Amino acid sequence: MRLLLSVLLVLVASVGVGLVSAVPAGSSITPPPPIEPIHLLSAPSPSQDSRRPWTRLRDWVIESIWGISKSCSHPHSSSHSSSRDRPPSQALARYGSDVVLRFYPGSAQDAEALAEASEILFLDVWASTPEFVDIRLAEEVISSLLGLLPDSLRTAYTPLIDDLAEMIHASYPTRRSAGVGDQSGFMPTVRQSAQLGDLFFRDYQPLSVIVPWMRLMASMFSSHVEKISVGVSYEGREIPALRLGVREADPEPARPRKTILIVGGSHAREWISTSTVTYVAYQLIARYGKSPEVTRLLEDYDWVLVPTLNPDGYAYTWESDRLWRKNRQPTSLRFCPGIDLDRAWAFEWDGERTRTNPCSETYAGDAPFDGTEAQQLAQWALAQTQSANATIVGFLDLHAYSQQILYPYSYSCSAVPPTLESLEELAMGLAKVIRLTTHEVYDVTSACEGITVSKSTPHVQTNPGSSGGSALDWFYHQLHTNYAYQIKLRDRGSYGFLLPAEYIVPTGREIYNVVLTFGKFLLGDAAAHLDHLDWEAAMATEPEGVVEAQQTLHQPEGGEVAAAADQTEDENENEDEDEEWDEHGWEFRR
């Protein structure tokens, strides 16, 4: 305890230095100004704050480091409604006439026509699922789009978001309280609550907060956490990561260390992917030594978590354009910078399709690995496998949105992965775990299928982003990572990329349980004694403030890990049927 207090006090003493050093060279992010002094021993009245002294000390440290004020409220609270009645002029200028439409293609011909029209008009396709395709466009372009579509599609659409500028404005956390409104950048906020709990997950956080948070985790939990870098971005920012794991001092004989890589933020606007990676990291960190499952997984594997592979683009979404997708390196057209990092990998790269159109949202560059950050991660992964005595056995690439679990291949539906049966088996188990966690349904399919085969719809292909050069295919084929998945997180389109902050924790809980099940599946027979996901124990050990409203959600008591993957497609499609939990395993009785 004394050592921990010493570390915290050192951190507090170095607040000024730490915040300045957290800003990358060349960044326009302005560090938060010095906060007003807070007396360490002062405590609010019991009616206002019932936190224990140690909890108050912890929250005070976090407030001091990141300048979080208790007077700040959640951006969606009514107390700030007056300041959010109308987006600022710059938001109206950029997004004022933009809307999001949802189309319902009924045939392969409809899908092909929609994809072709989207390319001709340089439209932003947000998502493709078995039921719909979401497209962002300016209101004045709607007539042009409809003119390029067949009659069957001209009425087969509905408005999804008709106030995009307002939704974008509301998606940012509120600025700090009065007196610092002239500061650039956004500060993290907290909800009005008797307990501040874990402030970091109360809202989306900018890069200038994420990096110091990662340093803090590595400092406080040095026995099993290490902050590392997997590369440097085009603009010179570090691509930070957390490596979690406990290694033997001198293993005899030396065996390759099995590594599971979890990546978020490849596409800058997908904020929920970045928050989810940090949430999963925090749960694994905090529960090591308390949860037998987590302890075993950190002893048997290294877990490398990269919250944002695209730090330049992520910073740009906070500073300029909330809906920016690509990285920020220049292209042949000065006014169209950026490369799609999930189309820049060397395996089955098909950048010829977009080579002449750098303005495309899926522009793959002029050559494989033209995207700096993709190249950096690939070099790091190769170095780990070739020189660092490591084997990457699992890869989870988090994206948004549409709630899908995708497995290789992305480049072609005619190519069959050699481990298809195992990939589908585990993917079905992961989807079931999510449904048991929050009752949300995630579809399972091959990544090549933007719109997939189902019993209710024909097989149509509408997703222009499903192509070669994906990280998913590269890790699976080049590094022989047998269990590689891309997971598209919440939601199914009500908010799209602008998912409100109150969904950070529920989405994080879904993927945390996915990660536990993923790790146990890889352990195989070695996980026999870890045959229960004890949901009640998991909730009991939940760090303070994380559970909140989720405590009211009924959770099953446990089951066998191996059977979590024993799920058929028919079961996945019948989620609305009455189901009864079998207390002896991961199976349902109907």
Curated annotation (Swiss-Prot):
One of its GO terms (biological process) is proteolysis. Disulfide bonds join 336-359. It is found in: Vacuole; Secreted. PROSITE patterns: CARBOXYPEPT_ZN_1 (PS00132), PEPTIDASE_M14 (PS52035). Its cofactor is Zn(2+). Its main location: other. Residues 567-582 have a biased composition (Acidic residues). Substrate binds at residues 267-270, 325, 342-343, 400-401. It holds the Pfam family Peptidase_M14. GO terms for cellular component: extracellular region; vacuole. InterPro entries: Peptidase_M14. Residues 23-175 form a propeptide. Glycans are attached at residue 389. Residues 203-522 form the Peptidase M14 domain. Zn(2+) binds at residues 267, 270, 399. Residues 1-22 form the signal peptide. Binds 1 zinc ion per subunit. Keywords: Cell wall biogenesis/degradation, Disulfide bond, Glycoprotein, Metal-binding, Secreted, Signal, Vacuole, Zinc. Belongs to the peptidase M14 family. Inactive carboxypeptidase that may play a role in cell wall organization and biogenesis. This is Inactive metallocarboxypeptidase ecm14. It comes from Aspergillus clavatus (strain ATCC 1007 / CBS 513.65 / DSM 816 / NCTC 3887 / NRRL 1 / QM 1276 / 107). The lineage of its organism: Eukaryota, Fungi, Dikarya, Ascomycota, Pezizomycotina. The gene is ecm14.
